[in-house]
Every structure is written in C-alpha cells, then in structure tokens.
Amino acid sequence: MQNLLELKGISRRVSDRFSLRDVTLAVEPGQIVGFVGANGAGKTTTIRAALGLIKLDAGEVHLLGQRCDANAPDETQRHLRSRIGFVLDTCPFPSTLKVGQIETLVGPAYPTWDRKTFAGFINRFGLDAKTKVKDLSRGMGMKLQLACALSHNAKLLVLDEATAGLDPMAREELLDELLAFVADGQHSVLLS
C-alpha cells in the first residue's frame, strides 16, 4: 500500500542555519501520525514543507505516491494538494467574512468540494453561518477549518498544533473527528 505522504531527506536552510535537516517521514493509510518537539524544532516548517508552502533546499515530498514539490509539474502539484485538508494553528480566513461565506472562498480551490458536506459539518460543529470569523473563539475557528478540510474528500489531513489552546472538551471532539476520519483505513492524519 502506498504512503499518503512521504518526506524524503528534506532540508531547509534559513540564513546560515538549518531549520530542517534531513527529515524523513512516512504516513501510511489509516494512520494518525503525530510529531512533537520543542518550540523552534521545525514542526511548523515540516508541515509547511508537506503542504508545499515553502521551497526546500534538499529532499523530496511525495503525496499519494507521486512527487509533489517544486520539481513536480504545477498541474500535478495542484491536483495532489487538492487531496489534502489542513488546519493551521490560527484561523487563516478573512476576519470580516461570515462563517457561511467561507465556502465561496475555499470551495473553488477543490474540484471535489461538497456544499452539502460543508453545511452538515457547520451544523454538527455548532457554528452559526452568520457569525463573523473575527468573533469565533479559538476552538470554533479550529472547527471551521476542520469543516473545510473535511468537505472536499481529502485523503490526508495535516494539522499544525490544532489542539494547542483548546479546552478539554474541544480537544476531545477534535480527536474524535480524526479517529472517525481514519476509521476506513484509507485516510490519514499528520499532526504536530
């Protein structure tokens, strides 16, 4: 069975020091893979590399068995990245948009976006479509990101410190969603 994500010897240098050095990681279908480290150890940089948000100095990123880094064709990168859902440590959506408007921003980026699924998660997570993003608590902002991440048939979820700062109930609810996501053995989660 092919890995959903594979990082092969990735390195990233900032100024004269490494922020990542020779990182290798594989995420198989059905796994929840977490990695920990001290502040500044490179967790967020690793996630940004997996998402293709930074240029690497060395190594390769493979998604769904195909190379997906700066050396892969743009169309291949777009297609493969559309199969990833992500949750960042802070809510990235424009603060003036309402929860119900986020779909118009995110949906077009994913060919497999499902409006009905998104509406279902908004309802299930107790989000009010009329609430502005700036008025969401940290936990509700995470739920909004998770609703987006789960609404386009992603094979892999990548979460950057998604449980940091969440209250115990919100953390447990998030972890329950992740367990449900991988239950079929075909989907995976990478989280820091």
Task: Please identify what each model-predicted range represents.
Residues 59-72, 79-80:
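Conserved ABC transporter NBD signature motif
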